[in-house]
């Protein structure tokens, strides 16, 4: 990537959101603060993401913050992706980009953005939503969108369901220990 392309990519990361593609959500029976803390810990990703077996902390930081990058190694052993958090609004939102992967997605969908938002639901529940944004300017990108859109949505929902189970099970085990 040339310096001009890198600068343009960084500008887009910070100032422009590509077109909306899909959104998945789940209600987790835990307070917003608990869900936020769990989601902020990058090392927890393999405990709830059904396809991630290992996370490498490229920035050396285990907690999310703008500019932190990490590599996710996927089950099957031959694929990985690098994710970078570019925006964090405490207790509300995390925006992540995908600068590198071995599937070739980043070569076709150059502006892929994932936005995770959290909303308090009553006193003890949290709605977490993951929205996907990317442009599909070329025929190849349009075809990839057509083919992969449902798979991305399904795998994202599986990830959210995994997070829900991990957080709720952790809460249940704490309650059991206290009893």
Segments predicted by a language model, with ranges:
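Hydrophobic-ligand binding "helix-grip"
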Residues: 3, 75-127, 133
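A conserved amphipathic terminal alpha-helix motif
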Residues: 5, 127, 133-179
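Hydrophobic pocket/interface hotspot
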Residues: 34-39, 45, 70, 85, ...
């Amino acid at each position: 990537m040339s310096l001009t392309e890198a600068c343009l990519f960084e500008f887009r990361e910070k100032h422009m959101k590509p077109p909306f593609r899909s959104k998945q959500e789940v209600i987790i029976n835990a307070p917003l603060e608990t869900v936020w803390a769990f989601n902020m810990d990058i090392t927890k990703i393999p405990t709830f993401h059904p396809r991630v077996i290992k996370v490498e902390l490229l920035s050396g930081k285990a907690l999310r913050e703008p500019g932190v990058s990490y590599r996710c190694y996927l089950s099957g052993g031959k694929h990985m992706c690098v994710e970078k958090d570019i925006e964090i609004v405490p207790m509300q939102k995390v925006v992540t980009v995908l600068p590198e992967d071995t599937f070739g997605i980043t070569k076709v969908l150059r502006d892929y953005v994932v936005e995770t938002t959290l909303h308090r639901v009553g006193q003890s529940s949290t709605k977490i939503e993951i929205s996907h944004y990317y442009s599909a300017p070329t025929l190849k990108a349009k075809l990839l969108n057509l083919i992969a859109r449902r798979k991305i949505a399904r795998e994202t929902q599986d990830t959210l369901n995994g997070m829900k189970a991990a957080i709720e099970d952790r809460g249940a085990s704490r309650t059991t220990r206290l009893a």
